């Protein structure tokens, strides 16, 4: 494949490596928390939720700052610093003598941010507008591919102990930084840089465009509730299968890889044809209906094959987010699309704070009472509420106005 600028394949490779590094550590996180905290899996679940929340909180406040710094000092420098900080984070977790070190590492990672924002900026800097969609698609595919490979590799490395995948993730992060240092040129030319402005770096200000989306309150409420429900996967999966099915790190890794593959296939092959046939409104309702059913069935699954069947069926839930975003994008003009997407990213950050706390508490509460599926029941309930909000506040309201 031909690229218009040498920085583009480097940015895509960086996204792939970074995503692999993130996925590697997931299968062994429960075992490491149990080891350091000397707690059972139910309490480890709660601690895992706190770790995810501290990352989300620091990332929420630091994300706009990192973006503004990349506009001031360039993409390459910010990418290098971010990746080095991620390497330090994983090293903290690999050699942590206590839980406090894990929390310090997660805070560092949240402040540093991830590579996705700067990598997107690299593509926007050097790619013609008519080709950006394809390049952004490749970037998303690299992220999805890394999330398939990472957990599988992490599950295999878990046989060496719960710290081995963190060592591998740290090595990948530093190798990623070395790759950028060696071969990636700066893409933001000096004349396009702007002074750092704290007003632009205000995370609360990112929500302002959401209040100018033409009567989209029900859509925004639905988007937030859906994102909180969907956080049941990253925040509880590894703990849930450890408690409910007593899976080891290898089995956890393969299941996460299967989940990533299922979602990626849905993004590539399912969303476009479904929206074309049914329209955005009905596509959202189809995805939410699948969420209500699949999440509820997860709560009562007792065999591994049942979980894999639900992973395949759960790909339909991937219809919800893109369809809601497509509807929202029609509520603002072209000049405000970027601001809208920034506001939606901030909404996702709120879900990333609230979701893990709610889901891990629900799982732990149920596990202590003999039923580990509490988090999935909560997710199913949230999907049902989102369905009602969307049906009454969007679909029927549009029919009345028509």
Regions found by a protein language model. Name each.
Residues 1-4, 185-222:
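Juxtamembrane intracellular "pre-TM" segments in multi-pass secondary transporters
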Residues 28-45, 235-251:
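Short amphipathic helix-loop junctions that connect adjacent transmembrane helices
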Residues 42, 158-171, 361-383:
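A membrane-interface helix-boundary motif in multi-pass transporters
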Residues 62-74, 266-280, 363:
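Helix-to-loop junctions at the C-terminal end of transmembrane segments
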Residues 105-144:
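Cytoplasmic helix-loop-helix junction between adjacent transmembrane helices
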Residues 281-324:
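C-terminal transmembrane helical hairpin of 12-TM major facilitator-type secondary transporters
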